């Protein structure tokens, strides 16, 4: 499938990641169309998937995605919670359109409803769970790429990528590998360069566990600002004790304003006394003038004389 090119061949690092994520472990049951991807069966009944065939189908799926001119015409769907985070991350890095959660029936066939879409390529997580979009895609001739386990039905599936779809780590790793291969085929990411996006970002995380981690991080968080701020403040206070003595010495001169009133008071008092005496002298003349009232009596004498 990879054309026999060494550049597209499976390397040891990717194989190690697949084995660590249990991508090679299938189900106990096997579909007759998936028998070609099974390497052998273990003693406990679990079928082992051939990872070489997995990588070949993954490269083929990446080539199909790159062939679409507009990345938004590629729809990625996952109704299972374990694959919704991986689908959203894949769409964010490749430009595809994600549908995480419940698929609206008739989105590909009913042109009347507002959710009507016309994708050119469809990528689903599990054909058994996402059977509705696969069935509608068959009505409008949309090619379908699916991550399939050994017991997954392959009806209306054009490209099947055999892998373990029961493990959240395996699901996240397969979407991460597919996104990396798409970026490499587009020329965005060189093949001799490591992708700076880690695989853990594609893994499913339990909301309760994430909340607990956030609470623990808040509890363990220490505020170093308080001890750092208090120490320099004490040092500043100790240093400012010396200027305080100079301020005490400077407080003596303010006594001069108190002497100012003493300087202005005597002349003010002398002037007031002088003015008071002058006024009294002037007012004393008024009673003297008032003593001239006997003139009225003189007039009265004139009246008696008359």
Curated annotation (Swiss-Prot):
Principal place where this protein is found? cytoplasm
Q: Alphabetically list the UniProt keywords.
A: Cytoplasm, Ribonucleoprotein, Ribosomal protein
InterPro entries assigned to the protein according to its UniProt record, in alphabetical order: Ribosomal_uS2 (IPR001865), Ribosomal_uS2_C (IPR032281), Ribosomal_uS2_CS (IPR018130), Ribosomal_uS2_euk (IPR027498), Ribosomal_uS2_euk/arc (IPR005707), Ribosomal_uS2_flav_dom_sf (IPR023591)
Output compositional bias ranges, type Low complexity. 257-268, 280-300
Record GO terms (molecular function): structural constituent of ribosome
Recorded hits in Pfam families, A to Z, give: 40S_SA_C, Ribosomal_S2
Record's subunit section: Component of the small ribosomal subunit. Mature ribosomes consist of a small (40S) and a large (60S) subunit. The 40S subunit contains about 33 different proteins and 1 molecule of RNA (18S). The 60S subunit contains about 49 different proteins and 3 molecules of RNA (28S, 5.8S and 5S). Interacts with ribosomal protein S21.
Task: Return the similarity comment.
Answer: Belongs to the universal ribosomal protein uS2 family.
- Put simply, this protein is called Small ribosomal subunit protein uS2
Q: Which organism is it from?
A: Bombyx mori (Silk moth)
Source lineage: Eukaryota, Metazoa, Ecdysozoa, Arthropoda, Hexapoda
């Amino acid at each position: 499938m990879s054309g026999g090119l060494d550049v597209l061949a499976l390397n040891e690092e990717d194989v190690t990641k697949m084995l660590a994520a249990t991508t090679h472990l299938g189900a106990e049951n096997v579909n007759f169309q998936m028998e070609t991807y099974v390497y052998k069966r273990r003693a406990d009944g679990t079928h082992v998937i051939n990872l070489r065939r997995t990588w070949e189908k993954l490269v083929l799926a990446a080539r199909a995605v790159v062939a679409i001119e507009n990345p938004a015409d590629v729809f990625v769907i996952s109704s299972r919670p374990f694959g919704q985070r991986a689908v959203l991350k894949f769409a964010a890095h490749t430009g595809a359109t994600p549908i995480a959660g419940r698929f609206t029936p008739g989105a590909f066939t009913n042109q009347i409803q507002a959710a009507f879409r016309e994708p050119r390529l469809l990528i689903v997580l599990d054909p058994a769970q996402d059977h509705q979009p696969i069935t509608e895609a068959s009505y409008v001739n949309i090619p379908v790429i699916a991550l399939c386990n050994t017991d997954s039905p392959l009806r209306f599936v054009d490209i099947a990528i055999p892998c373990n779809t029961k493990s959240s780590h395996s699901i996240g790793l397969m979407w991460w590998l597919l996104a990396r291969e798409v970026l490499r085929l587009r020329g965005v990411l060189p093949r001799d360069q490591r992708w700076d996006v880690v695989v853990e970002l594609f893994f499913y995380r339990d909301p309760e566990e994430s909340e607990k981690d956030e609470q623990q991080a808040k509890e363990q968080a220490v505020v170093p600002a308080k001890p750092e701020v208090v120490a320099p403040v004490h040092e500043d206070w100790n240093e400012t004790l010396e200027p305080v003595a100079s301020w005490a010495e400077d407080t003596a001169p303010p006594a001069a304003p108190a002497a100012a009133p003493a300087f202005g008071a005597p002349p003010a008092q002398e002037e007031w006394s002088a003015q008071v005496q002058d006024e009294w002298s002037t007012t004393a003349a008024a009673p003297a003038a008032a003593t001239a009232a006997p003139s009225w009596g003189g007039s009265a004498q004139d009246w008696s004389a008359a």
